[in-house]
């Protein structure tokens, strides 16, 4: 495998260059703006392209060293691509709602994950049948709530080594927690956002469904490339694996790697977004 390639045409077709209405701009993004058209800021893709390449390189290197990537995107149009991309490369995601303290209070979050796993086990082995209807319904409600909030990180086993964010305005709490802990941040930053706190900026549209799908796909493929490098370093003969089994090998290794890791401390359109 190799670091994913992408063209300027792909960025254009996905609408990556469309920013927000000019009156909503954040001056901190001025250097990445090419101009405006019909009252909409246009991002400079000659800057976006190499900055996205750099972000992919960082993702690959992080995973190649055995690091964990946390995908973060809780806005409606980001939820499915974020989850799909993370699962495809055996990484982790938060796509429902960022819970305060997810990173900075990991011990408490770990307890909630343990609770989710406990309920899942009881559901699977039929233990819930011995409870009253009220108790069973209470557990089922807890299970649904915990799965939505923590299902994407239930096997993470510790703090991530890097987070990838869609929409820095919406996910400002996640970025603040990452910065407090010294966790690098890769993020798509639109014209109405501040790049402060982002280590690897990807200037781009953070609302269009096609743009979000493109970012997530590229990040996922970069992570897969990093995992392939990790497997090769571990002596796995990737050439001997059947087509498609690299991803399976990665998925099988991920939970084991998480267990071995030391415990950590505590319908958007493909056009500029309308006013909220």
From Swiss-Prot:
The keyword Membrane does not apply. Coiled coil: none annotated. Keywords: Ribonucleoprotein, Ribosomal protein. Residues 252-276 have a biased composition (Low complexity). One of its GO terms (cellular component) is cytosolic small ribosomal subunit. Pfam families: Ribosomal_S2. SUPFAM superfamilies: Ribosomal protein S2 (SSF52313). GO terms for molecular function: structural constituent of ribosome. Residues 251-276 are annotated as: Disordered. One of its GO terms (biological process) is translation. It comes from the Bacteria. CDD domains: RPS2. Belongs to the universal ribosomal protein uS2 family. NCBIfam families: rpsB_bact. This is Small ribosomal subunit protein uS2.
